[in-house]
Every structure is written in C-alpha cells, then in structure tokens.
Amino acid sequence: MWIGIISLFPEMFKAITEFGVTGRAVKQNLLQVSCWNPRDFTHDKHKTVDDRPYGGGPGMLMMVQPLRDAIHAAKAEAGDGVKVIYLSPQGRKLDQTGVTELAANEKLILVCGRYEGIDERLIQTEIDEEWSIGDYVLTGGELPAMTLIDAVARFVPGVLGKQASAEEDSFAEGLLDCPHYTRPEVLDGYVVPPVLMSGNHEEIRKWRLKQSLERTWLRRPELLEKLALTDEQKKLLKDIIEAYHIRQSKTSDNG
C-alpha cells in the first residue's frame, strides 16, 4: 500500500514509519509512506504557508498555492487510481467499516490541515473524501492521519503476523472486543476464567463471543442496532439480557 502525506510537520510521521507494526511494514516494503511539505512549494523567502480568510474573523487558513502544488506533486508520484483524503472535523466519522473501505485502496493521499483549515475551493477540486476521527477539534490533521494509517495498515497482507488478527479484532465484526488474559493464572486474587485454560476451542469461541456481545450491549448498545445478528448471537444476547435483569432484580431486593 502506498500513502502520500501532505503536512507542514512531516517529522511527526516517524511515529508511523519507524516504530511498531507499521514501522516494520515500512522496512519490509509492505507499506510505503512519502511526505510533501507545502513549505517546500513556497516562493517567498519566509516560506509563508498561511493567509488571511476573506470575511475576516480569528485565525488563518493554509495558503492555497503551496498546498495545491504539494497535492499535485503527490498526485504526480502516485499516478492513476489514487484517492485524496482531507482529515477534517466535517468529514465522515471513521469507524471499522470505513477503515475496511479505505484499506481496499492501493494508494491514498492524506491532506493534513492546520490553522483554521483549507480553502473550500481546494476541497471541491482536489479532495475526493473528507474523514474525521471524532467530534472534537485538534490543532492539525497529523494525528488523525496517523490514526487512519495505523488502522488501514493492519489490513495490508503481511503487516500482521496472521491476517486473522485484523479480522478478529474489536469492531471487525461490529462488536467490542472480549477480555484477554495472560500469565499469571491468579493476579491479586483474580483468576483467569477456567474455560480459557480448558483447551476446548469451541467453548472458548462461544465464551469470547458472549463476552463481546455483553460488552457491546452494556457499553455501546447502538452498535448492535447496525448489525444483522446470527441466530447464535441472538440467543446469546437474549441470555445475557435475561441474566442481567435477574442480577439487577436481586440487587434491588437486597437493597
């Protein structure tokens, strides 16, 4: 997978290219990350990259010419078939479904805004899609871009030890992840669930599925509304809800 970055702070992306799973993917040429800094496309001695917005108001916008030239340079290197993404609070909110869609692209250019954003005409003419990582404002698009890269890179063949790791992760099936345990068997009086040490793979699978369903129902119930549950999942969820109400009833009686 090839990813081009448009950023005033390309050094920030060393966190992606030099460390962890993504850093290893870059070293193995499974993931290619190239950066373009709009400052390198300025024509004045001060390397100016911001400009005043029409209509006044606080803050500045990224200057059109250096940003557009940087995008064009990235597009020229990428060639045909590249999708240009602008990281923006106004964009579609990134979730696992979106990650899967973006991971299907062989080439992406990620435009990281700064200041108060970029000229709307650039969004209309240069940007294919806008994406957001949440309903809050950051100082720039670099951290959202790194989040997106980390998420989509997991679906590139060979990046993870097992492709199943990406497919079984939290949200991969629309559910929250189940609890995980490692040694020691007993930690401060808390014991690893016996089923996980039973060696019975089918029972372990069912336990994990039930835990995922219960966590999702308790913490993010809106996610379940989007899913077409299997018969097995429906039955497990019914059991979970019934058991929960029984516990609540006993608690009320004791109170």
Swiss-Prot record:
GO biological process, one term: tRNA N1-guanine methylation
Keyword Ribosomal protein recorded: no
GO cellular component labels: cytosol
UniProt xrefs under InterPro entries: Alpha/beta_knot_MTases (IPR029028), tRNA_m1G_MeTrfase_C_sf (IPR023148), tRNA_m1G_MeTrfase_TrmD (IPR002649), tRNA_m1G_MTases_N (IPR029026), tRNA_MeTrfase_TRMD/TRM10 (IPR016009)
Function summary: Specifically methylates guanosine-37 in various tRNAs.
Gene label: trmD
Family annotation (Gene3D superfamilies): 3.40.1280.10, tRNA(m1g37)methyltransferase, domain 2
Coarse class of the protein's main subcellular location: cytoplasm
Protein name: tRNA (guanine-N(1)-)-methyltransferase
Keyword RNA-binding (UniProt): no
Subunit structure: Homodimer.
Subcellular location: Cytoplasm
Catalytic function, reaction form: guanosine(37) in tRNA + S-adenosyl-L-methionine = N(1)-methylguanosine(37) in tRNA + S-adenosyl-L-homocysteine + H(+)
HAMAP family in the cross-refs: TrmD (MF_00605)
CDD domains: TrmD-like (cd18080)
UniProt family annotation: Belongs to the RNA methyltransferase TrmD family.
Species the sequence originates in: Mannheimia succiniciproducens (strain KCTC 0769BP / MBEL55E)
Keywords: Cytoplasm, Methyltransferase, S-adenosyl-L-methionine, Transferase, tRNA processing
